Amino acid sequence: MNFKQYSPEELKECSMIEVVHSVLGDKRQATTFNELVQEIAQVLGLSQEQVNAKLAQFYTDLNIDGRFINLGENRWGLRSWYPYEQIDEEILPQPKPKKKRKVEEDGFDDYIEEDEDDFDDADGNADEEDDVEDLDKVLEEEDGDDDDLDDLEEDEEDDFAEEELEYDETEEEEEEL
């Protein structure tokens, strides 16, 4: 787009985005943001104060408009110049492969729950009768524990009775004095 053919009034009606699009189209190469701003100011006849006032909105418009692409390092170009596959290659930095750490062996085998089941029953036959017998033994032991508790309670009662007698005897002796 040749800007010389437009009158100053017509140029003032053009948006900064339209001017950038035509400038990049004429140059046919990526340009830094600062160079684009300088060319816009020159074409539109804007002062530095006017450019500074519109700079934030211009940058936002440049990012939002789908016709432009940021190529990194503050360089801008037209999206139509780059096929989709090339955009990914040029824009995205290639990730560096991460170094793998060596895993130190602790010398212990990993615990496998399946192995535990193999040692539960030596003859290979897991009978429910064995489980019932084990439960019976546990219950018998618990019954025996109750007898022990009864014996303890009786002993404590006997001790208490003896202490009570001793106390009564001591009281009688004190009264006599």
UniProtKB/Swiss-Prot annotation:
Assembly notes: RNAP is composed of a core of 2 alpha, a beta and a beta' subunits. The core is associated with a delta subunit and one of several sigma factors.
Region (Disordered): 91-177
Residue ranges of every copy of the HTH HARE-type domain listed in the record: 14-81
Assigned protein family: Belongs to the RpoE family.
Role of this protein: Participates in both the initiation and recycling phases of transcription. In the presence of the delta subunit, RNAP displays an increased specificity of transcription, a decreased affinity for nucleic acids, and an increased efficiency of RNA synthesis because of enhanced recycling.
Biological processes annotated in GO: DNA-templated transcription; regulation of DNA-templated transcription
GO cellular component assignments: DNA-directed RNA polymerase complex
Lineage: Bacteria, Bacillati, Bacillota, Bacilli, Bacillales
Protein name, UniProt field: Probable DNA-directed RNA polymerase subunit delta
Originating organism: Bacillus cereus (strain G9842)
Ranges annotated as biased composition (Acidic residues): 106-177
UniProt xrefs under NCBIfam families: RNAP_delt_lowGC
GO molecular function: DNA-directed RNA polymerase activity
Key words, A-Z: DNA-directed RNA polymerase, Nucleotidyltransferase, Transcription, Transferase
